[in-house]
Curated annotation (Swiss-Prot):
Similarity-based family: Belongs to the SMIM12 family.
Name used for this protein in its record: Small integral membrane protein 12
Any coiled-coil regions, as ranges: none
Subcellular location field: Membrane
Organism: Homo sapiens (Human)
Gene Ontology terms: cellular component: membrane; mitochondrion
Domain of life (superkingdom): Eukaryota
UniProt-listed InterPro entries: UPF0767
Length: 92
């Protein structure tokens, strides 16, 4: 009797396995839901770093007066002296 049973189970394994797996999965899902309880309240998503940076830059722009800019005539050198005169001791 057992050899016939195992032959039938082996032959029809896909047809037997799927319903058994489906029932076990459904029972496990509902059991886990029952043990865990109600769904937790959704947590507010934290802003990403790029969003926080954009907000900070917008706040900085709002606080500035864009009509007051430094004249190019006031800027005598565009590069710092330390970079250009590093190897020239007579200029230091």
């Amino acid at each position: 009797m057992w050899p016939v049973f195992w032959t039938v189970v082996r032959t029809y394994a896909p047809y037997v396995t799927f319903p058994v797996a489906f029932v076990v999965g459904a029972v496990g899902y509902h059991l886990e839901w029952f043990i865990r309880g109600k769904d937790p309240q959704p947590v507010e998503e934290e802003k990403s770093i790029s969003e926080r940076r954009e907000d900070r830059k917008l706040d900085e722009l709002l606080g500035k007066d864009h009509t007051q800019v430094v004249s190019l005539k006031d800027k005598l050198e565009f590069a710092p002296k330390a970079v250009l005169n590093r190897n020239r001791p007579e200029k230091n």
